[in-house]
Amino acid sequence: MSGGFQPAANPSIVQTQAARVPGRAHVLVIGNEKGGSGKSTTALHIAVALIGEGSRVATLDLDARQGTLSRYIENRAAYAQRKGIELPMPRHAAVALSTLPDRGAAEADETARFEAALAPALATADFVIVDTPGSDTHLSRTAHVWADTLLTPLNDSFIDLDLLARIDPDTLKIVRPSIYAEAVWKQRQLRAIQGGRPVDWVVMRNRLSSLAARNKRDMGNVIEALAKRVGFRVAAGLSERVIYKELFLSGLTLLDLKRGGGGPSLTLSHVAARQEVRDLVTALNLPPPAPFAPEAAPATEASTPVPPPAG
């Protein structure tokens, strides 16, 4: 752990609502340096929920090699075409890793790719949802600097929590923040240097069991303590349900089941799960859509974005 990392000494760094930067979309980055935390599922459910509220939504997949979010959206488009129905669709783009052998050149190439995909989304959407890979990559770090809201899905396991903090096994006290918490802090610092507004970091407890197990209670206590030390908000995520895996092949979300079209029948369990999605969107406390400035670049122009000015 580098000596430069410091906990959030000022409580004001934890925002109750991330401020919208005038004239551009609000960027929601879904980040966690561990695969299998439900980032892509969460991304599409939030996107569909926001579209249902009347917002214009763009999605970016930075894990183009695995491409879970991209395939999810492809499956969705194919399902709608097969069934002859209309489904809410975000404007989607995938950003591939550079193949250049030189590291510096590759990172510059990836930055350019990311900015080219981000620019039209910033200019034409109300929200840009960025799905990041479950590993530390240059693309992921670049996206984190742009986050107005950072959402970190966290499986209810001390294995997953280890990315945020080292925990004493006997006392369950926080020994020190861990690799991802440090990475987020560094990106916060870089954003501040570039004149960006404070990031609203939200950690969602994902795949919660319905059982009142001791592990669940201990996790809750540790996460609440860590939130105060590192500087994030805690939100209830999505419970562990088979339906999420079943919906992937059709590209559907729980919010689509009421639309018909041959999808799974709606059960009481699905109704409860759908409410979890809505509760999550509410907990994010995203800013309302705002009119774009007249000088905003049209979607067809690949103007290079610059970090937002301090507000």
What feature does the model see in each segment?
Residues 17-53:
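Walker A (P-loop) phosphate-binding motif
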Residues 1-22, 192-311:
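C-terminal lobe/tail of nucleotide-utilizing enzymes
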Residues 44, 48-52, 74, 145, ...:
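Short, well-ordered alpha-helices that flank and scaffold nucleotide-derived cofactor binding pockets
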Residues 35, 68-69, 148, 238:
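Generic structural signal for small/hydrophobic residues in well-ordered secondary structure
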Residues 53, 133-236:
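Conserved catalytic-core segment of NTP-binding enzymes
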Residues 27, 59, 90-94, 201-203, ...:
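Conserved beta-strand scaffold positions in the cores of enzyme catalytic domains, especially
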Residues 31-34, 49-128, 134, 169, ...:
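P-loop/Walker-type NTP enzyme "switch/lid" segment
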Residues 73, 163, 248:
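Short, flexible helix/strand-to-coil boundary loops that buttress conserved ligand/catalytic motifs
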